């Protein structure tokens, strides 16, 4: 149920796209994302910083999708998003007391300092690689191939990365702590998946728009 709620904007996006087209669907996704964050705030009286950042990305980049008609911008946008996240994660090593990934997951699991640093750099490498992969496919292959890569390739990379991350983290979790932390870990991973889902939503918006132009 939590994952379904996290994917609420994505589901509405696809429904609106089938019925009314890309621009109405993009507007619906923006409105749905704002409503989603507003609901979380009304329920919990607080919003995580990552939720605010991802909402801002959807509003700004989704708004750009509605206004701009430049195919080059559309194809570069997912790369800019991924590299932007890489910069945020890298910057968190120098601003604040903890890397941002540690702030997200510190209450759920206990890891050595070196493990948190390695985990953070795994995320940074993932975002950089995703950005490079997007540009490579966009410029080396036709638009149809790029759209397929955006819809299926990067989603597959994302799922594989989450699995690798889970295996890495599991090396440091004591079996005696599993039952106590199960619920919290599930909440943290749901939040992480939500963030990735929102980034993938922006990628889907780009892909569908470019496909329509073709």
From Swiss-Prot:
InterPro entries: YciB. It comes from the Bacteria. The chain crosses the membrane at residues 11-31, 50-70, 81-101, 119-139, 149-169. It is found in: Cell inner membrane. Keywords: Cell inner membrane, Cell membrane, Membrane, Transmembrane, Transmembrane helix. GO terms for cellular component: plasma membrane. It is a multi-pass membrane protein. The keyword Cell inner membrane applies. HAMAP family: YciB. Belongs to the YciB family. Plays a role in cell envelope biogenesis, maintenance of cell envelope integrity and membrane homeostasis. PANTHER family: INNER MEMBRANE-SPANNING PROTEIN YCIB, INTRACELLULAR SEPTATION PROTEIN A-RELATED. This is Inner membrane-spanning protein YciB. The lineage of its organism: Bacteria, Pseudomonadati, Pseudomonadota, Gammaproteobacteria, Thiotrichales.
